[in-house]
Amino acid sequence: MTLLPLSATAQEKSGNKDSEDEYKKSAVAKNYRTNMKAKNYGEAKKTIDNAISRYEEAAKDTKLYIYKIEALNELVKQENRKIYLNSKPDTVSFFNNIYELYETGLKCDSIEEVLLTQKRAEGKNTKNKLRGGIRNYLLAYRTNVVGAGKFFYNKKQYVEAFKFLDMYMRTKHAPLLTDSSVATPLNDPNDRVSVSTIAVLSAYASSNYRGVMTYLRESLTDDNIQSQIIEIGCKSAAELKDTTSMLLLLEKGFEKYPEVDYFFMTLMRFYNSAGEYDKALATVTKMVELYPDSRDYNFMMAKQHMMLKQYEQAVKSFTNCVKINAEDAESYSSMGNIYLMAAQDVYSGINVSVADPKYFEKKNAMREYYKKACTCFELAKKFREDKPELWLEGLREVYFKLNKGRELRSLEKFKK
């Protein structure tokens, strides 16, 4: 008995396997037609899907995609017929088959376009032969695509909602539907803004921040919920680490909707964290101008002045706070701290001898600041004795500096 070399045996087995796995277009087409004739549209589609996923040649064969479109169209019509027969249709399958029909049509058109581009490069005069037919299939379900997006949005299935709305918007520009050489025109209503708005809301609700940014510009023209859309854009840009877009949207939102806390507060945090205290001051100043009787905006304005070391202006703003609310312990405490700093600055600047008249001028100025600080801290204590962190350390210092021993001892029972 003659033994075959191991390598030859393996090669023969490999060859047999390749032969068994060879793409047979005629067999695929026959299987497809058999299932279509028997109205087994799901099986017909599965036959094409298997061939496309398994064989490279099949994946580039436009004829197979046309077959798949036909099968999908029958599946859609099958569900549609149930409506007229008072039978319960599978709405989700109905919509998903339409979506897949669109995907398949776009894929088929792109494959044909690649082939035509190659032929044109060779100097051949060619045109799309399949585009018109595919377009007719897609246009038949045009309203269903956007309808599916709204259906899933109302069901709070936001990933699915965005998928359909995105398909609807993308295909508004697809050559497959906009090619003027094809007789049937794309006749969408003027719904770009409304559909973009729902797409943005769906994308944000499903944490699809890139999806938000894709349709944000269009949706920003929707005046009905513009402030909400701008806020969504800001938050999405922040998630994407797109600081430039986030800041532009924040500034736009604050300019148009200063009453929306999100724009104001986020802008303030951004400017302060970036060390742009002057911009933060300008922002809060606008709010004080709009709401002069707001204690909170006046208080924030005072704090911004302090960050810029504009202490006199800060005291004026804190004074406005206590005019609005005479028991504002925080503002009294803040003014006390400013007067303490002023006293300490005077002390550090005393570099003249006791014999110099300026020495006593500075000592008196320092004492006046301590007195003002003392008054402020005592008022803070009066109105918020339960919050010693506002006044305890300040009073200890001013009582010591003003030689108020009895008052200083009275503070021993308090703990910060």
Which functions belong to the PLM regions below?
Residues 44, 98-101, 161, 212, ...:
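Single-residue signature of alpha-solenoid repeat helices
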Residues 12-80, 85, 91:
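Start-of-domain marker
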Residues 51, 108, 168, 218-219, ...:
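Canonical positions in the second alpha-helix
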Residues 56-59, 173, 224-225, 258, ...:
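Short coil turns that delineate tetratricopeptide repeat
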Residues 67, 181-185, 191, 198-201, ...:
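Canonical tetratricopeptide repeat
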Residues 64, 177-181, 195, 228-229, ...:
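TPR alpha-solenoid repeat register
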Residues 73-156, 163, 171-193, 341-376:
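Short coil/linker segments at helix-helix boundaries
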